[in-house]
Design a protein with these regions (language model features):
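Active-site phosphate-binding strand-loop segment of PLP-dependent enzymes
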Residues: 100, 112-167, 179
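Short active-site oxyanion
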Residues: 57-59, 82-85, 156-158
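Generic secondary-structure signature for well-ordered alpha-helical cores
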Residues: 14-21, 45, 49-53, 102-105, ...
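Conserved N-terminal alpha-helix of the aminotransferase class I/II PLP-enzyme fold
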Residues: 21-69, 76, 90-91, 98-99
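Conserved small/polar residues in nucleotide/adenosyl-binding loops
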Residues: 192-199
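N-terminal "arm"/small-domain region of PLP-dependent enzymes with the aminotransferase-like
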Residues: 1-30
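PLP-dependent aminotransferase-like
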Residues: 67-135
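Conserved active-site segment immediately N-terminal to the catalytic lysine
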Residues: 160, 174-186
């Protein structure tokens, strides 16, 4: 998890008792109120601007951390052929795979587990299933210090990525993905990487 700038913490503290003159905290207001509606619409607008999210993509703010998506993704996407392909590059992609395997036919198309997840595994497109409902990766692995520098070419199969550790740390071409998800508890961070043979 990254540190929030002091200015952000001070503003949040100041608005804890009275959000912009509303007489209440954000934690107290109804999610149906005009004040809260303006907050969520403003947050979505800023996220769309910063990430250059195309208009044909929806932005969802959901309860729970990114780990809840380990079940939500297969429950919502693994519906046609009940198949999904997973790249195991660390702890979180492995957890995502194990959870998804409870709901359908999940295939590990590449893994660097034998190398203690010290690198992103080599991908062989011949292992990718053209009838998979989606293809899942975890773009950045903070525990192991690895990151995808190039995205897999999945053809007509939607690419799904956990970007919890790298959201807003570098530009991402959102249009390359079917779904991107991230947990807010990691905050928005700066990510420093250097070229390495491990990548």
């Amino acid at each position: 998890p990254s540190m929030l700038p002091e200015s952000v913490l001070l503003r949040a503290a100041a608005e804890m008792l009275d959000y912009e003159g509303s007489g209440q905290s954000v934690m107290e207001m109804s999610h149906r109120s005009k004040v809260y509606d303006a907050i969520i619409k403003g947050a979505e607008s800023l996220l769309r601007e910063v990430m250059e999210i195309p208009d044909n993509y929806k932005v969802l703010f959901l309860q729970g951390g990114a780990s809840s998506q380990f079940a939500m993704v297969p429950l919502n996407l693994m519906t046609k052929n009940r198949k999904a392909d997973y790249v195991l590059s660390g702890q979180f992609s492995t957890k995502a795979y194990k959870e998804a395997a409870r709901f359908g036919d999940c295939k590990v198309v590449a893994s660097s587990k034998e190398q203690n997840f010290s690198r992103i595994p080599d991908l062989d497109p011949k292992e990718f299933r053209p009838d998979a409902d989606y293809f899942h990766i975890c773009m950045n692995n903070t525990i192991y210090g690895t990151v995808f520098h190039a995205l897999p070419e999945t053809g007509d199969v939607p690419l799904v990525a956990d970007i919890s550790s790298c959201i807003l740390s570098r530009p991402i071409d959102v249009s390359r993905f079917g779904v991107l998800y991230a947990g807010a508890q990691k905050n928005v961070c700066l990510l420093y990487t250097s070229p390495s043979p491990r990548d």
